[in-house]
């Protein structure tokens, strides 16, 4: 269930858009994004009272001098274009508060223009191939609250960044930092620091000076230890330390009483740190691939937990402590050594997503059928034992939307799948299916049906009645009806074939019925007898006792 169990997600605030009902000379907002524009329409500059302009995701190559007419503009989004340089007129927008130039191949030297935007509060320069930032930006701008520099080639920050005394959020993910930017430790207004996916080997003790820090992202670095001073960041609620080199967490972290989310996946902990069980306010806990064999008894105290990732560990059974977490909505147990689930699992009445892929179940774990709120079930067995059946009782999961049962040895699917009104995704890839139940055509909510690498030769003739089905995959099946060449053309060709084949069958039935009726009218037999199929080589008449005439001899009581 990799798309549900993942590292801590976060993103900077996105400015709210309110599309105007009318466009006139007093329009305050224009959205011209996603229009394949190669230039900014000059008509935009006639709306002199514009406050917000969205031009992202186009092919714009330059900003015209006419931009200076927009004296009142506060928000300008130009991300995902082809800008290489910025015109000097951009620096005349004295009211501009939010500027997004992300995903443009901008020359860093042209960014000097930005230093004239003295009202700027938000500057986003994600993935612009920057190796350095013009120092003058940090010298001249004093109101920055958000600075986005993710996905560049930065190795350090200019010392002048300490002038940003109002900075609250800084995003430096996926750069080339090997040393933690010490300058950040004097920016006391910082609330969010994102340094994921760098090569940082240590966090300085001075991090404790940031007492207002709320979210700290340090995943995918080279941290072997953590500074005890981090416990002084008393407002810290989100901490992502996934995929580092940690073996333990400082005991002083127990003082972080506002923790709601922590990521520790991909570290060599081998056991759950005792202090984590004291963070009873935790909502999300990532412990995947940490070498765990068991959970502490006190783990049951995490009663507010909604998301728990225990995937890729060494668990031989589903810990009973989990069954006490009544608010749990997502549980990842993938890639362990679990062979059986406890009957108490049904107490997780709010569970919506359950990952069991890659375990050691000998048969389908029917304990999951008591999870009435379950919406997604992952039970593909890409390693170890293979499941040979899915029980008909699967219909008990009436809330189920997605079922992933790939990489098993299933030869058939339960008919009851057709009575699951909310089923949208059914993944049966890499099994031994020889046919689909006709009842599958009743699963009207179905949007994706993945059937690659099975033994299918035919599809149900009414499969085209699934009007919501958008994805149907049939590669690596010995298909005959429809033929492989039809299947290769996609859904539309398959639906057309099924419809035409169905019409042919209806016509054949009508012709057969007409022929039989005609034969009866002409006295060639009773209608019921004509309906009986005749076997090859068994057409000789029988006597009253049911015995056939012997060839060359008359039947008993008959004259030769």
UniProtKB/Swiss-Prot annotation:
Pfam families: LRR_14, LRR_8. This is Leucine-rich repeat and IQ domain-containing protein 4. The keyword Protease does not apply. InterPro entries: Leu-rich_rpt, Leu-rich_rpt_typical-subtyp, LRR_dom_sf, LRR_domain-containing, LRR_R13L4/SHOC2-like. Residues 1-20, 529-560 are annotated as: Disordered. Keywords: Leucine-rich repeat, Repeat. Residues 533-560 have a biased composition (Basic residues).
